Amino acid sequence: MAVHRAVLALLASCALAACSTSGPPADSTGHAVVPREGVAYYAQSVAGHLALMRAARPLEDWLADPAAPPALKERLAQVQRMRRFAVDELHLPDNASYTRYADLKRRAVVWNVVATPEFSLQLKTWCFVVVGCVGYRGYFDEAEAHALAERLRAQGLDAVAYPVPAYSTLGWTNWLGGDPVLSTFIGYPEGEVARLLFHELAHQVLYVADDTEFNESFATAVERLGGERWLAQASPAARADYAAFDERRRAFRALTLSVRKNLERIYAQALDEHALSAIENENALRASKHAVMADFRQRYAELKAGWGGHSGYDAWVARANNASFAVQAAYDAQVPAFMALFEREGRDWPRFYDAVREWAALPKAERTAVVQALLPSPSDE
């Protein structure tokens, strides 16, 4: 899921607001460079999140509103049950988050911008107060996100702006009413709404500064495990609806994973080809990359032909580049390790969370090594 979170901070040091504060990046000399758009970026973060909070009303108010559509009421009542399930069955935080609903009247809550070098899947990072450095930058205004992506492309980077249906403030806004349920995802299949809520609540269990892959993989593991448990007690119709949705997603994920591995292979191989001149190497890389992407789009067309007209991934495929595959990796690269840890802890949620907290307390290099040790070897995949 690309679920990816754009305004990660409603910080104690930033009164009232989602002040996702862009830490100064380093220039080639290692010195800090303060972005010219810094103040404007803070302002849009504050204004955007406060507008979202103002739009949110308690679920009970929506359920009592005679003008609210019956289908919406039914889903919001279901969300209340999901929220209780998250606490009782998954031991996720019991707080104000997802007890209110906001109709944003737009297709995304924020738009994230991600970027990589032309021949790498290493995400460019931006740094924020408290939450550390992350591989994306979020905007409430779609045009601003696309403008940043265009500036990054002008610098020679692969960059993309994409819509995000939800984000987490990590529990820091519970005193303001918490993160609300949003119109941007309320219409998803039942199982997917449950997974999204579980994912975002998992970020409130723990969050490690400067380790996007660890944070997102942990939350993705919780969403998958929790989603399975929710669907096990859901109606047959809900399971069937979700099964069709998830089958397409699994097939698409398998396709994009193979493309990601192909890109990683050609970029790694290029580092060893010292005999080629820089220009020859660059031209060869560009040709190889183009071939991989052309093959990807052809294979996607073949996959889509069996989906009965479903076109939900068309926009992703149309804009796909290194950055698209890199951000996808951040959400699932370490998931198998967390799944293995859950089994090791006897599928006991409190024990699992305690074990993850122990990992989180380690220095990053040591933490990564511990996680890698639980990942399957390539021959096992």
Predicted regions mapped to residue ranges:
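Bacterial N-terminal signal peptides that target proteins for export
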Residues: 1-8
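C-terminal motif of bacterial Sec signal peptides marking the signal peptidase cleavage site
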Residues: 15-18
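Amphipathic alpha-helical packing elements
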Residues: 45-86
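Acidic/histidine-rich, surface-exposed loop or edge segments in extracytoplasmic proteins
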Residues: 53-70, 124-134, 319-320, 336
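Acidic/His-rich structured neighborhood in mature extracellular/periplasmic domains
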Residues: 81-249, 264
